[in-house]
């Protein structure tokens, strides 16, 4: 299909899919749908003025969520439509490794968000790279999608406890070119004597960017 699809088209289509679920009520925040350089704007909001056509050679970042009768969601995926240059795949892989490092954390050993945040950034930092936002925020239950006191960030020392829900969303942004972010929601679960994260988000991750 050669029809041109814009950021607003993609955003509206996603909303249409969500409405299929009878328990869906409304978005949990303004969708971030950024292609190419717009994806590098962390809190981008598309408008008629900024709206871009999603081009085959660009990567596309979409951060969205919904309020459902049974809870709140927040998910980010970065996808591609053609083979990307090695430098982009390398950055995506480093972000993914950071995401996995958070997801597999032993919370008995790393007890607060500050300690876990460092695990997420370690692979980028080896190359002198970083991202200018927290790795994760607390999430409410049919409430605020950003809800404390817990978070995974450089300065948060709140002890993480069983039953808390947070996001796991490391990223990398090259201003004027592209943005990468991978976000799941995770639940802190007790497994025998261990405290660990359990993924609540089951959307596939873009393998062609690894």
Where are these regions (language model features)?
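Active-site neighborhoods and metal-handling regions in enzymes and metal-associated proteins
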Residues: 1-210
């Amino acid at each position: 299909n050669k029809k041109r699809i814009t950021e607003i088209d993609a955003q509206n289509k996603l909303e249409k899919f969500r409405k299929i679920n009878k328990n869906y009520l409304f978005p949990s925040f303004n969708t971030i749908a950024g292609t190419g350089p717009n994806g590098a704007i962390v809190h981008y909001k598309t408008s008629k003025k900024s709206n871009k056509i999603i081009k085959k050679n660009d990567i596309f970042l979409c951060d969205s969520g919904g309020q459902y009768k049974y809870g709140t969601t927040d998910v980010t995926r970065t996808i591609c439509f053609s083979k990307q240059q090695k430098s982009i795949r390398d950055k995506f892989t480093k972000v993914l490794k950071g995401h996995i490092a958070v997801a597999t954390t032993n919370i008995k050993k790393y007890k607060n968000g500050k300690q876990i945040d460092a695990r997420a950034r370690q692979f980028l930092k080896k190359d002198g790279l970083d991202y200018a936002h927290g790795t994760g925020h607390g999430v409410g239950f049919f409430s605020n999608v950003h809800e404390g006191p817990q978070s995974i960030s450089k300065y948060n020392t709140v002890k993480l406890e069983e039953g808390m829900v947070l996001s796991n969303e490391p990223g990398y942004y090259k201003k004027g070119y592209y943005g990468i972010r991978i976000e799941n929601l995770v639940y802190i679960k007790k497994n025998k004597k261990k405290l660990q994260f359990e993924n609540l988000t089951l959307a596939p991750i873009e393998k062609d960017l690894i």
